[in-house]
Amino acid sequence: MSSTVIILIVVLLVILVAFYAFAILMRKKTEDRILALEERKESLFDLPVQEEIDSVKKMHLVGQSQTIFREWNQKWLDLSSNSFADLEEHIFEAEQLNDSFHFFRARESVADSEAQIEMMEGDVEGIRQGVAQLVEQEKRNSNKIQESLDLYDNLRSDIADNADLYGTVITELEKHLANIETEFSQFVTLNSTGDPIEAAEVLETAEEHTIALRAITEQIPSFIKTIEKDVPKRLEELQEASDKFIAEDYILPENVNLKERMDDLQHHLEESSSLLEQFELDRVEAELDLIQERVEELYSIFEREYSARRNVEKRSSVLKEYIEHIRVNNKNLLLEIDHVTQAYILSGNEKGYVRGYQEHLESLDADVDEIIANIEAKAIPYSSLSRRVNSVVNALEDIEKNQIKISETLSGLRDEERAAQEIAERFDSELRTIKRYVEKCNLPGLPKDYLDLFFMTGDRVQNLFKELGRVRINIDTINHLVDVSTEDMHVLKEATTNLTDHAVLAEQLIQYANRYKASNEQVAQGISRALQLFENSRDYDGSFDEISKTLEIVEPGAASRISGVYFKNKPTPDYL
């Protein structure tokens, strides 16, 4: 026999042994799962479901409880008679398939059986829980009934012992107590006839009603006190305040009808009492809040009129005097204006304003006469009179403020003239000082733009002297000339300083540069250009710039150094 054949035989034997081992292993695994299914089936079947159902049957349930119990009982009957038999059949089929080495079909059958028993276990657990709930509900009802009855009995006793605190609401409370008692009777009937679930619902409703009624009874005494004592007392006090208000000759605004408002308050009080008997506590509280708000509103109206009267009596007594005081001020102000206009031209229409104040005073005087007549007639609310009095006082205060402002303006004219005169004299002196300062520099001449600036500034100052010398001075014109002269003097001083500084520095730099003139042609040419600008063109700024650039060529920094020394030692000019 060849070696190839031997190898094939060995391989075949190995395959057969491996397949046999696999078959034995698969069969063992499936067999273990089948045994586990058998154990789960026995455990499920051994549960005391039937005994639990039989114990509930003895309770003789009715109504909703009976309906629920029948559903659970029917479900158990279906499981015990059909599902268990079907499960047995599936397990037996799996055993047959496994014994005949139909491994894959056996595994599928076992998987189906496992799913089926898992569903059955869930159903059985649901049945047991449902049945247990019926039993538990009956126990809870038995335990809870006494607690609920105690709540009810305590409530009834409290209401009976404190009937005087509830006023007319006692009848409605007794009706609600009777309804709750009926609910307890209904519970007893349902629970004793075997319907614990529906009985539990009725008991819960009765307990909720008891608790709610308890909460209501705790609030009612406070509302009763407010409705029957506090509010009537407040309304009585309000009526007394109203009577006193009228007796003291006060007049209410047209939009306030006192009788209607008092009747309205009484209506809301009666409405709150009616709502309380209906246990509409939120609406009762809203009505009482509304009453409180409207009572306070009436008191606020009274207080406003009292306050207005005090204001009217305080201010109206001095209105005539105040008007006369302002009128005298106006007359004096007109005289002052006439006097001032002899020396000054007024451009603010002061006289027109003062005459306008006089006309306004006549109008206000007529208003005051009417106000006083209305006060004496006692036919208009003081709040209205107070507004008119305040309006007159405010108008008089505005007139007086404007009178003071005009008077201060007139009084200040002489001071403004004096200040302008001093400024003109100072500027004139400074111009002469500037002229002398420039002359001391011994310059070959002055640039045209500088001369124009100097003479223009001098003309400004002379115009200021001219305006100040007029018979009637226009102070606005004077102030304008002071402003422009001040600006011109500032510009002239800066121009003078720049001119003289650059002229002096240009000369110093030219002298310093002469040391390089013979040895450096560029320096010689620069000096020549700088001298040309200095002596012929009188352009001292240009001459300074030219010689500075020239020096920078041969000795960088020399111009800056010399300029620094100059400015450090330079004395302050007299015109600054």
Swiss-Prot record:
<dbReference type="InterPro" id="IPR010379">
    <property type="entry name" value="EzrA"/>
</dbReference>
<feature type="topological domain" description="Extracellular">
    <location>
        <begin position="1"/>
        <end position="7"/>
    </location>
</feature>
<dbReference type="GO" id="GO:0000921">
    <property type="term" value="P:septin ring assembly"/>
</dbReference>
<keyword id="KW-1003">Cell membrane</keyword>
<keyword id="KW-0472">Membrane</keyword>
<keyword id="KW-0132">Cell division</keyword>
<feature type="coiled-coil region">
    <location>
        <begin position="254"/>
        <end position="305"/>
    </location>
</feature>
<dbReference type="Pfam" id="PF06160">
    <property type="entry name" value="EzrA"/>
</dbReference>
<dbReference type="GO" id="GO:0005940">
    <property type="term" value="C:septin ring"/>
</dbReference>
<feature type="transmembrane region" description="Helical">
    <location>
        <begin position="8"/>
        <end position="26"/>
    </location>
</feature>
<feature type="coiled-coil region">
    <location>
        <begin position="105"/>
        <end position="134"/>
    </location>
</feature>
<dbReference type="GO" id="GO:0005886">
    <property type="term" value="C:plasma membrane"/>
</dbReference>
<comment type="similarity">
    <text>Belongs to the EzrA family.</text>
</comment>
<feature type="coiled-coil region">
    <location>
        <begin position="356"/>
        <end position="402"/>
    </location>
</feature>
<protein>
    <recommendedName>
        <fullName>Septation ring formation regulator EzrA</fullName>
    </recommendedName>
</protein>
<keyword id="KW-0717">Septation</keyword>
<comment type="function">
    <text>Negative regulator of FtsZ ring formation; modulates the frequency and position of FtsZ ring formation. Inhibits FtsZ ring formation at polar sites. Interacts either with FtsZ or with one of its binding partners to promote depolymerization.</text>
</comment>
<keyword id="KW-1133">Transmembrane helix</keyword>
<keyword id="KW-0175">Coiled coil</keyword>
<keyword id="KW-0131">Cell cycle</keyword>
<dbReference type="GO" id="GO:0000917">
    <property type="term" value="P:division septum assembly"/>
</dbReference>
<keyword id="KW-0812">Transmembrane</keyword>
<feature type="topological domain" description="Cytoplasmic">
    <location>
        <begin position="27"/>
        <end position="576"/>
    </location>
</feature>
